[in-house]
Every structure is written in structure tokens, then in C-alpha cells.
Amino acid sequence: MRRWNGWGDEATVVELPAHGAAFLENLVGTGQRLKDATLEQVLMQVPESRLSLRHPLISVDAEVRVRHARGQSLPDWLAMRSGEFGVFPDAVALPETAAQIRELLAWAKGQDAIVIPYGGGTSVAGHINPVESAKPVLTLSLERMTQLLDLDEQSQIATFGPGANGPQVEAQLRARGYTLGHFPQSWELSTLGGWVASRSSGQQSLRYGRIEQLFAGGKVETFAGTLDIPTFPASAAGPDLRELILGSEGRFGVISEVKVRVTKLAEQEKFFAVFLPSWQQALAGIRALVQARIPLSMLRLSNAIETETQLALAGHPEQIALLEKYLALRGARAGKCMLTFGVTGNRSQNALSVKQAKKLLKSFGGVFTGTLLGKKWAENRFRFPYLRHGLWEAGYAVDTLETATDWNNVDHLLNQVEASLRQGLADEGERVHVFTHLSHVYGQGSSIYTTYVFRPGDRYETTLARWTKLKRAASQTIAANRGTISHQHGVGRDHAPYLVAEKGELGMAALKAMAQHFDPESRLAPGVLLED
């Protein structure tokens, strides 16, 4: 069963190993555990619904409302763990068809209600949280719209309901010999409609593309009517309407159907790990790889601190010690950086790609360790979000943030973001452990994905204040140093204040005009993407 106050399935537990706890204690200090609220305590706080008129497609059940009240950001985690949710949706709608979505939008308008589209509930930027409002709030969950509706094998276009999560998408496609190839870290829970709405990026985007390359068309239900976006392989017929929906985050309408470009399942897939002696050699190596257009399916480069942290938290200290000895003998010592890469395709193509990658990385001092660490990465690729629970139990808070920039700015921006976080709680005498990886690389530049660990305060309010201070410092640094405010998490409410630095006043006015066109009364996700 899915956790009501954290990530994923209750049966999946990722604990912090003892030597990992000692590693963090040395870097950050002794952990401080805060007391968690129980579900029963939270249920007692859920008020009566303000939606007096009932509808057969909505639920006002208290637990259903609790389970749809928050996403997965650290503030959401603190709210769920403390039991201080603040605001709950007045009801949760559960449509099964596009016609029912249209019916619910009309019903919500008649009730003068706000509508929050809800996919998998994995937002880490405040997309789905109800806020204080004089109007009742209807959360519209798409969790029952999960079916593969059509597969055009000639055109390789699949049509899905928007609520299909990653496993549901892949299971239905793989049964027919296809894959979407979109694997964000939230893959187990996040949905196809949510990926489109937030411009998601999957771990193997180097082969399959980001969601904007995969999204071929679909339908969106708006307060102004149904927007039907047909599929074309390419078109010069004016602006691309797909781009109106990609990244719209529910402000323009509710996605009711998604058409995506799919690929035949590959004959073979392998992942490898390489260690490079220094960050500068590693950075130059990964840039050379992607700009050489060697057909790899994924690249992930951890900086030296992330490499050290991953090895410390991996478990099996004896095996790690042997690995460290092997790497040191071959020139990858302190300051080394781990690069994981994958190949996906037919065997001959993969063999050539691996040969080319090895030759290129060897020129940057790369030390190859085969497929063992690559296999471990693939096996555990969706388990990192579960580690938040293990860290919390040990008395630590963890969060992530991300951006992207051109290659000539990657090193500078990464260092500035890390410094803003590392120094962010200095006025409280608190240390912050910060580390980064590059996981989506392009010929032009790269994403920058940073994780930070700090100690909670003595109260939940203090802990939230610490997060707010860190998040603001990093976001301001990103906006001031040529970074996008989001590469893959989206804008939501948390990043909305920084969007103008990227879009400009004229661009923001255009976005607001489009929102007004599709949603004249501003009922859909107010405050998300665009500050109201």
C-alpha cells in the first residue's frame, strides 16, 4: 500500500547503513529525530467539505482527501510528518473518461470551486497543494484513466489515458514489444499526463529524448472547450500547439488523452561505470562524449563529493575498500568522479558504442570497472526517493534541486549553487552536506542536479525555516547565474517567483494571456506556474 506520509510503497524500506550514518555525523553533526504524527491524528483535523452539493464522481472521505493534499517536496514531507497539513481539498474527483472530466469542470464552475489537476502526486515544487481560499477546492485525480487506448504500429504512436504511471505505461507497451523509454526517478508513481504537464526528463533521454520529443499530441479539457492536438511527424503550420501544453502545469486545462512516440524494444541494454581522476577531466570527458554524438542511452557524472557519498552509503564496506584500492593503483584517488553510461540497441551497435566511449574516456584518464556498478545503478535507479525515509529515521533532512545551463557556465553555476547551500545555515552554526551530478547532457550544455542534507531543527517550524532559507539562496543563485529555474521538476508554486528572470515581462504577459484564454475565471491551479 502506498504511504500516506512519504514516498512509495510501505513495504519498501531503504535504511541508512551504520557506516553511512557515521559518515553523515562527521560531516553534518548528530542527527535529530522529530516526532511523527499518526494518520488517525491527521484525520481528526480534516474539516467538513465546503462542497454541499454531492456528485457521484467525487469523494469527500477524509482519508482520500489527506492522500491527495500534498506532493513530495521537503515542505510536503514536513507537513505530512508533523501532521500540520494546513489545507485539505474539499473533495477528490475520480473521472474515468474525457467526458467525465468535462462534466466535472462544468460542475466545479457551478459550485464556484477551484480545480487542481492531480496525476501521481509526486510534485516537488508545490503543484498540487491546496492553499487557503474562500472558494472550495476540488482535486481532480486522473488515477483511473490508465489504459493504452490505441497503438499504431506503423506510425509508432501510442495513445494513453493521462493517469498511467511509469510501470503501467511500460507494462502495456512491452506486452506489444514496445517501450516509451521515459524513466524519471519518480517513474514508479508519476504519470504520463504529469510528465507532459511538467516537461519531464527521463534518465535515458540521451536515446529516447525528453518528454517534449516523445509527446506527439492529445486532448486537453479546458473551461473554454476541448483542445485537440493532432499528430504530425513535423509541421510548419505556425506555432506548435503541443508547446502550449508542455510545461503548462494544469493552468490551461486538464490533459485527457496523451499520444506518444514509442520505440521497439532493444535487443540489448548494458550500463558501465568509469572513474575519472578529477572533476575537470570528468567534465571535459562527458562533454566530449556527448558532442561526439556516440550513440549512448544515458550518461550520469557524479562530482567528487557525490562519488564519495555514494560509495559511503552503498553498504558492503569491504568491497568498497577493494574498489578504492584498485582505483588508486590506476590513478583515480581522492577527488575521483564516477561516470555511469549506458548503451541500448542491437549488440553490434552497442559493442561499437562502448568501444568508442572507452577510447575517448581513456584519453581523459578514465578507469573502467565493467558492468557491476552499472547493474547496481540500474537495479536501484528508482530507490533513491525511499532514502529520504531512512535519512529521516536517522535524524537528517534531505532535498534536491536542479537547473541547466550551457557548457561554458556549468562549472561556475554548479560551484555557486553548492556554495549557496553549503553556507546557507552558517548563521545558525549548522553544516550542510552538498553534492551534485550531471544526468542529462546535450551538445549545448547540461542539467545540474544537487542534493543537500542538513539536520532538522528542534521543531518542525524551525526545520521548514531552514529549508526555506536554503531553497531561496539556491534559487536566487540559479536565476542570477544563467541557469533555468527548472530543468525537469517544473515551476509549481515554489519556483514561480523566479520565472520572470527567464521569460521576461513580455513573455510572462503572453503566458498569462493564454491562461486567461483557456481559463477566464482562473479556476485551474491558481498560483501554479504564474503568480496570481
Language model region names:
Residues 491-532:
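Activity-critical C-terminal alpha-helical subdomain
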Residues 54-80, 283-473, 481:
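C-terminal substrate-recognition/cap domain of FAD-linked oxidoreductases
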Residues 90-96, 270-277, 341-343, 401-405:
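Short, well-ordered beta-strand elements within core beta-sheets of diverse protein domains
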Residues 146-302:
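FAD-binding subdomain of flavoenzyme oxidoreductases
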Residues 1-106, 124-156, 308-313, 375-399, ...:
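N-terminal flexible segment immediately upstream of the FAD-binding catalytic core
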